[in-house]
Regions:
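Transmembrane alpha-helices and adjacent helix-loop boundaries
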Residues: 1-336
């Protein structure tokens, strides 16, 4: 098997982009919000980045970053009314937002409507051209196209690692503790002095920015985007990454995206039965492990075995409950 086959290398690229998208929805889940707007923000980042690089002739990097910022701006506008909603109402509102965005892109001339945008500058192709310029075609027995794909994978991995590092940093900060408190009980968190709306908006905007970046990368990897790429199917797919891998830890999104990106390719030989088996495996796993494959306690045990942590794991919900009970006792003592 030729591991440098462009098809296999493209699967690796899609896995990394899927991991980024899974992390984008992880932030809203971490703050107790079931948002289904990730595909909408992804489409904003994809179209803005593609149009800027294709029609405004801006560098790919600049277009992708601006796409992420525009997605964040849209999140501010959408988030002000929707983050006050809870549960199913928030899910329906954000799902509706995604459909509205898709229909808008479907009817705009600048997006080429239903025909989609083609000829988008490709990151692998640009790096392949760079490989030719550096005269490394054939170096170590690897041709320029493979070098271009490998360099694209390295760049995507660096972006993914930076996003994961940012998530870990956030989780271990005051912001992460506020997210956990809101997820455990937003009413109790508010009584403890946490600005619930502010932190929910923050999670919403961060998630939108990451989704916008993921969309920009997707557009410049596939070289073509169409409004149907961001339909309801994409919404479900993105949600499955953290839910399947473990929605309580950032590594769950990475693991879930790896398995769910690879699984259809592994089952390809089953032809017509592939989707049935794929769906059955998802149902079985959700029944056996409703919290996903990875849990907080499991990640904590692995971290302590590797020497990254020394203190034993204590569930965040337990800590928050104890703090809230202590807070109530103090209030009762003051009133007494």
């Amino acid at each position: 098997m030729d591991l440098l086959n462009p098809y296999y290398l493209q699967i690796v690229m899609f896995f990394i982009i899927n991991a980024i998208m899974g992390i984008s929805i992880y932030f809203t889940l971490a703050s107790g919000q079931l948002s289904l707007g990730a595909a909408g923000f992804m489409s904003v980042g994809a179209y803005v980045g593609a149009i800027l690089s294709l029609k405004a002739d801006l560098p790919i990097v600049v277009g992708i970053i601006i796409g992420g910022l525009v997605a964040s701006l849209v999140a501010v506008i959408i988030g002000l009314p929707t983050t006050r909603l809870r549960g199913l109402y928030l899910a329906i509102a954000t799902l509706g937002f995604g459909e509205v965005v898709r229909v808008i892109f479907l009817n705009l001339d600048i997006t080429n409507g239903a025909l989609g945008l083609s000829g988008i500058p490709s990151i692998p192709q640009e790096l392949t051209n760079l490989a030719y310029e550096l005269d490394i075609d054939g170096l170590m027995g690897i041709d320029a196209v493979a070098w271009g794909n490998l360099m694209a994978i390295i760049i995507l991995l660096i972006i993914l690692v930076l996003i994961i590092a940012f998530c870990v940093r956030i989780n271990n900060s005051r912001i992460g503790r506020a997210f956990a408190a809101i997820k455990a009980d937003d009413h109790a968190a508010e009584l403890m002095g946490i600005n619930v709306v502010y932190y929910k908006m923050m999670a919403f905007i961060i998630g939108a920015f990451i989704a916008g970046i993921g969309g920009g990368l997707y557009a410049h990897i596939t070289n073509f985007i169409n409004p149907t790429d961001f339909s309801y199917h994409k919404v479900v797919q993105i949600l499955l990454f953290p839910v399947f891998g473990g929605s309580n830890v950032v590594w769950g999104s990475v693991l879930g995206s790896f398995i769910l990106t690879l699984l259809p390719e592994v089952l390809r030989f089953l032809s017509d039965y592939r989707d049935i088996i794929y769906g059955a495996l998802l149902v079985i796993l959700m029944a056996v492990r409703p919290d996903g494959i990875l849990t907080e306690s499991m990640v904590d045990k692995i971290s302590r075995k590797l020497g990254f942590k020394k203190a034993p794991y204590i569930p965040e919900s337990q800590v928050l409950t104890e703090r809230f009970e202590a807070y109530k006792r103090k209030q009762e003592e003051k009133q007494g």
